[in-house]
Amino acid sequence: MSSVLQEYEAIHRELRSEGFIRSDYPPSSDEVLWNKKVMTMKREELDKLKTFRLKRIVKWAWDHIEFYRKYWKSKGFEPDMIKDWKDVVKIPILRKDELRKDLSANPPFGTIFEPELARRIRFVGATSGSTGLPTFQGWGALEMDYFQEGQARYLWTFAGVKPGRVYANYLNMSGFYSWGPPVVETAMWRCGATAIAGGGETFFSWKNRHMLIFKLWKVDVFATTPWLHRLIGEEAKEQGWETPFKVLLLHGGAAAEKTKKKLFEVHPNAELAINVWGTTDGHMAIEIPGQEGQLVVWEDMEIFDIVDPKTDEPVAEGERGELIATLLNHFTMPLIRYSLGDYVKNEFITDPDPKFGITHMRFAEPIPGRVEWMFSVKGKLLFPIYVEDAVNDVPDTTGMYNVIVYDNEMDKLKIRMETKRATVDSEYDKRAREIIASNLGLNPDDIDIEWIRPGQAVWTGYKLQVFLDQRKKK
């Protein structure tokens, strides 16, 4: 066995023996927290742990990964510059363009994989490639084990996924594959639940069969996008039955506040609706029930920092910027100071949450979307999620819409919006524009609505395509 593989397996054993990855599962059903020892660590212990793990992953990447060694040397960075976890901002930011260059020059996976571990990859996830060459994330035994641990923490603690519960995962496997059977369903099994993987086929093409499954299996916890949650609830109401879901897990994009309210209307048995943010690469943050919009980050797994996307410099506390992430336990393919592209506020709450006593930091407000989704109408900075909240106030609509963005600075907000009305008169159109304008701080004349029939909004898999990008590439 090579020294690299020996070190990798030793770290894996350490993580299990120290209890960061729970190995005795499922727990007793009366345990409230999946991993109380880790989830309630003292702040000083978390900070010390992050410093140790950041130093370790940086040294590992320097010693074993050709890509990082070359890239960091070209930027004047060396591992001994890291003295504390807060020094993460000294590490050069890595963006997808750099990965794509490496992939193109060194197919199939580039030089960012540790060569010995690359031969032992358990699973490969890929981005859609919608903005260029797809990028990949390789998962070995350690990475899979830890990510399943992270999933189990929120599924057990927040969603009540325990023995006897039935969980249905309706995330499009082609777009969210690392959140499908390789990880999420296996996390379900750790919790002792029954898992139904529904993401291997399109809901729309097998709708009647899926609706029958929901009724027959009495699904307790249902995971899909906010828009599909709503569509399924609306259709069940029209068919004269109530969905059985008690917990709604909202993936694939933050749910607007008013969308959440609509979900409780169409799913009358639902007790919780929880925003779950994550990426194919293995990042995650989950909304704590009772703490609206506050998504907790497992700090033993990653470090976040926030920068000005124009300068790459850290933004001040309370300012907004681009989310940068460092995975602390991904050794097969490290992602260190990697740009996730989400636009967030640099404000985190570190006091224990009042319900569970979880000490890991949480975002002070929801993640509204990606940096490239930002657009401006008459100088007003907007995201699709802001438009969605406004659309939900318009009567006789399905809540399904597409924002058409034709420039970064626009004179008009153009929206394709589904209406249940057979005909749209000028008065209805005027009232809709007034409602949306009032919500967004615009004038009604600044808004153009293209009215479409239910089912005509553009979707990509299980996700509503809220952002139709028609900007010319420069």
Model-identified regions with their sequence ranges:
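Conserved AMP-binding/adenylate-forming
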Residues: 255-351
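AMP-binding/adenylate-forming catalytic core of the ANL superfamily
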Residues: 222, 324-440, 444, 462
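Residues that mark the start of a beta-strand
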Residues: 162-168, 246, 414
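Nucleotide 5′-phosphate-binding alpha/beta core
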Residues: 1-126, 132-153, 157, 216, ...
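General small-molecule cofactor/ligand-binding pocket signal
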Residues: 196-199, 203, 273-274, 447-452
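AMP-binding/adenylate-forming
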Residues: 141-157, 166-230
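Adenylate-forming
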Residues: 219-262, 273-281
